[in-house]
Amino acid sequence: MSRELVIVLDFGGQYSRLIARRIREHNVYCEIYPYNISINKLKQLSPAAIVLSGGPSSVYQEGSPDLDTEIFEIGIPVLGICYGMQLMAKKLGGTVTGSTKREYGKALLEIENPNLLTEGVSSDLLVWMSHGDSVEQVPPGFKVMGKTENTPIAGLFNPDKNLYGVQFHLEVMHTPKGREMLKNFLFNIADLSADWTMGSYIEETVEQIKTEAQGRKAVCGLSGGIDSTVAALLVQKAIGDDLTCIFVNHGLLRKNEQDQVRELFEQEFDINLVYVDASDRFLNKLQGVTDPEQKRKIIGEEFIRVFEEEARKIGDVDFLVQGTLYTDVVESGTETASVIKSHHNVGGLPEKMDLSLIEPLNSLFKDEVRQVARELGLHREIVERHPFPGPGLAIRVLGEITKEKLDILREADAVVSDELKKIGLYHDIWQLFTVLPDIKTVGVKGDERSYDYPIILRAVNSEDGMTADWYRFSNDVLERLSNRVVNEVDGVNRFIYDITSKPPATIEWE
């Protein structure tokens, strides 16, 4: 099934993924490729439009990202953003210079020549700038779109060739009319049809898996998280009972999580599920280990051993299902993968397993996986479940892991989640969890001195986990959470709220 494609050429800008996501929000399929993709490869992909991203370089800097001028002669619309606009201007005969006044932050754009990109947008437009170089003279055939106080040419366009450039970042929320301008580019200029939906994605993906994998066996390592759950359901729709999910309980799950996952898959989805309680095995391996990277390594290696043992019991397995996302594909620097590909030593799995991969989510961002989950009829509890790391509570118990610490943390986590669900805030938060530090503090309970653990609450909002901001609870809510945790969780006498954003902190503590 062919679909319209918009390509974002990545020049190293921090917003390249955001551009792709904004395009997809308009039901237009979009992929990111490196700026140095060959012109032949680009033509093979047959995009309906191209977006040139921003980037940290100067167009005159030695070794700065460049592109083939033939891109502008293919005959399809091109939109250059920030560095992308400067490069377009330079390659087509304009002049770019280092600006004496760098422009960072909000600016007011005065539109001098209205055009298809600015249609329906008011003349004085708030935009977000982040640049040093500026276009001093537009290329032949181009017009100036508008200016800001410090940038005389803040946008340019050639209506005959459908080439447009903006010095500002229309993809960020700080440019309020940016989405409208992007919509104008996609539909007024590129004449796209907005036919890419999660429903069509499901249909297309299931058919592709059916064609290549029907009648052959596949296994899926299930975590209970949304990625592996949605991946498993898509594959089950394609190959039915030939899929077996393996759910390894490493003893580091949240309260009652193993029961919830088993009930969901065995009763509601009727998927073949192998449940392995390997909690003692994992905890024995982790005894005395305090370094977070060592914890991750031990858990990863042990998971592989358990998974391999169970997969061999099934016998004659051809495929391994993974919940790889498009962000993983982009980060690895590879081109977009097909749903099914040949692969050895997957995630450290021994080469002799000789499995091919099925990755039904490798074209999707995290928020799109949630949309697919809704299309598949998954409950809100699963769809909006907060992200949970592979090593589980091992990296939320700081220092050495013991059964006592895990029990305390599980209970605290359950109490916080319960309270926030009661008052209707749980689903407003992107990620929420508690942390148990490797210290005890003095307190008073009743008339007696206590010496117990503190609990740290971490709650953040984010779009993709790359950056995050701490959630602003009211003082009343924090007081309720503190009272419940300290009174209901044995071994805790202090409650702390982490108000650090990412960056400088990471979301997880380890």
Curated annotation (Swiss-Prot):
- The active site annotation covers 82 (nucleophile), 169, 171
Q: Domain Glutamine amidotransferase type-1 spans what residues?
A: 5-195
Name of one Pfam family that matches:
GMP_synt_C
Source superkingdom: Bacteria
Q: Name one GO cellular component term.
A: cytosol
Q: Where is the GMPS ATP-PPase domain?
A: 196-385
Which of this chain's residues are annotated to bind ATP?
223-229
Q: Which reaction does it catalyse?
A: XMP + L-glutamine + ATP + H2O = GMP + L-glutamate + AMP + diphosphate + 2 H(+)
Which E.C. number(s) belong to this protein?
Answer: 6.3.5.2
UniProt keyword Iron present: no
UniProt subunit comment: Homodimer.
PANTHER family for this protein = GMP SYNTHASE [GLUTAMINE-HYDROLYZING], GMP SYNTHASE-RELATED
Stored HAMAP family = GMP_synthase (MF_00344)
The protein depicted here goes by the name: GMP synthase [glutamine-hydrolyzing]
Query: Which organism was this protein described from?
Result: Natranaerobius thermophilus (strain ATCC BAA-1301 / DSM 18059 / JW/NM-WN-LF)
